């Protein structure tokens, strides 16, 4: 098609010379070439794949027809500004047939078009700059890890205690303890060798953990680990963040069998660990034993003398029971319901817990936010709040939060 257009242009070159005797028309075309900045147009044409002659000479009209195909989409946006540009954008292809109606206004409006060519070039380039800014690669930034992958605030003793207490048999093997910790806390799914060594050291060097050998009915590898029966409540109110006291067992077994037979009660008390009994209860029990021995020795006396030791013994018994009751109020039993946000009942899912949500508990646990495969039941469903008797203070939380998070009424 290019050859056909060229041939058509050469055929009509002689006819145009008969119509226009004056050669100024062609000089004005060359002036228009410099005024319009056709060099930049030709470079734009070469960028789009249309290579043609850079100088507008004999085939100037032919170049104009090709310029229309490449430039009219970008020039039509500016054509309403000038009348000459509108004539150029509309009738560029018809220049081969009627050159004089379009060339004279274009030659007259050369300065205005020259001012607009730079603007057109800038419009052609601006999408490229904008796209380069959009597609610019962002610098890799090291963001902080979320709370689900943060280190839990529990010690290794707390983790082991939680794992053992949640098991139905209250004893676990070492691999089961590892697996329970990794399932509940995603942080421990990496660097396993480090923290597993720490778990083994904690099991070996703490008196609150006992190693139970496997029974014949439970074949397998590895011994079981369980909590010492006298360890009691090591963690205050079921909170595993801090131990209330360190458990140490007095392993002072009597080697004399005669002392075992004569002093069975004292031997059992020496085998017991110091986390179970207080000095006050020991002194009261000693006084009780002494009073009973006095009562036995005084049985051979007269009834009035014998009545006084019995009444004294009853008085001491009542005092001893009152001391035990007082200690029962001070020291909670081993089996109790944990209502602390970091207790094992709140960490593990339980279908029996249908308590209301305490907003302070919600805030604390969502701050740490330890996810697990049971994240749906752990994070929301199993966080039991205070008991039904201890209703939450809703006025405080309404003052703290602008909008209530959960229905605390």
Curated annotation (Swiss-Prot):
Example of a GO MF term: protein domain specific binding
InterPro entries for the chain: Fork-head_N, Fork_head_dom, Forkhead_box_C, FOX_domain-containing, TF_fork_head_CS_1, TF_fork_head_CS_2, WH-like_DNA-bd_sf, WH_DNA-bd_sf
Biased amino acid composition, Low complexity: 263-286
Start-end of DNA-binding region: 150-241
Primary localisation category: nucleus
Nucleus recorded as keyword: yes
Record's note on what induces expression: By mesoderm-inducing factor activin A.
The entry's keywords: Developmental protein, DNA-binding, Nucleus
Compositionally biased region (Basic and acidic residues): 250-262
Keyword hit for Lipid metabolism: no
Positions of region (Disordered): 250-315
Subcellular location: Nucleus
SUPFAM superfamilies assigned to the protein according to its UniProt record, in alphabetical order: Winged helix' DNA-binding domain (SSF46785)
One biological process term in Gene Ontology: central nervous system myelin formation
Domain of life the protein comes from: Eukaryota
A single GO cellular-component term on record: nucleus
Physiological role: May play a crucial role in specification of both the axial mesendoderm and the ventral nervous system.
Name the UniProt record assigns to this protein: Forkhead box protein A2
């Amino acid at each position: 098609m290019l050859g056909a257009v060229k041939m058509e242009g050469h055929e009509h070159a002689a006819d145009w010379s008969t119509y226009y005797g004056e050669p100024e028309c062609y000089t004005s075309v060359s002036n228009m070439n410099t005024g319009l900045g056709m060099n930049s147009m030709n470079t734009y044409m070469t960028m789009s794949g249309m290579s043609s002659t850079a100088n507008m000479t004999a085939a100037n009209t032919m170049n104009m027809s090709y310029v229309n195909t490449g430039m009219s989409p970008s020039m039509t946006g500016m054509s309403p500004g000038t009348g000459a540009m509108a004539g150029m954008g509309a009738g560029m292809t018809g220049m081969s047939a009627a050159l004089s109606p379009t060339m004279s206004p274009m030659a007259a409006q050369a300065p205005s078009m020259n001012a607009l060519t730079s603007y057109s070039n800038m419009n052609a380039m601006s999408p490229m700059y904008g796209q380069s800014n959009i597609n610019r690669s962002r610098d890799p930034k090291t963001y902080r890890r979320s709370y689900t992958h943060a280190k839990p605030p529990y010690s290794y003793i707390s983790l082991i205690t939680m794992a053992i207490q949640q098991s139905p048999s209250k004893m676990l093997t070492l691999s089961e303890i590892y697996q329970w910790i990794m399932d509940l806390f995603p942080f421990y799914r990496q660097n396993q060798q480090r923290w597993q060594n720490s778990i083994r050291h904690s099991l070996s060097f703490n008196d609150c953990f006992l190693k139970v050998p496997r029974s014949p009915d439970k074949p397998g590898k590895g011994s079981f680990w369980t909590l010492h029966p006298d360890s009691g409540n090591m963690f205050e109110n079921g909170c595993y963040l801090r131990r209330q006291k360190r458990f140490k067992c007095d392993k002072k077994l009597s080697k004399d069998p005669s002392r075992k037979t004569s002093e069975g009660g004292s031997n059992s008390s020496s085998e017991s660990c110091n986390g179970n009994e207080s000095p006050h209860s020991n002194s009261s029990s000693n006084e009780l034993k002494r009073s009973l021995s006095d009562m036995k020795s005084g049985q051979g006396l007269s009834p009035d003398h014998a009545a006084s030791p019995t009444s004294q013994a009853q008085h001491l018994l009542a005092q001893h029971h009152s001391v035990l009751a007082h200690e029962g109020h001070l020291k909670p039993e081993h089996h109790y319901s944990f209502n602390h946000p970091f207790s094992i009942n709140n960490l593990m899912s339980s279908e029996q817990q249908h308590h209301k949500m305490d907003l302070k508990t919600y805030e604390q646990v969502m701050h740490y936010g330890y996810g697990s495969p049971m994240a749906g039941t752990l994070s929301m469903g199993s966080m039991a709040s205070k008991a039904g008797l201890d209703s939450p203070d809703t006025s405080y939380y309404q003052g703290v939060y602008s909008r209530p998070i959960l229905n605390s009424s």
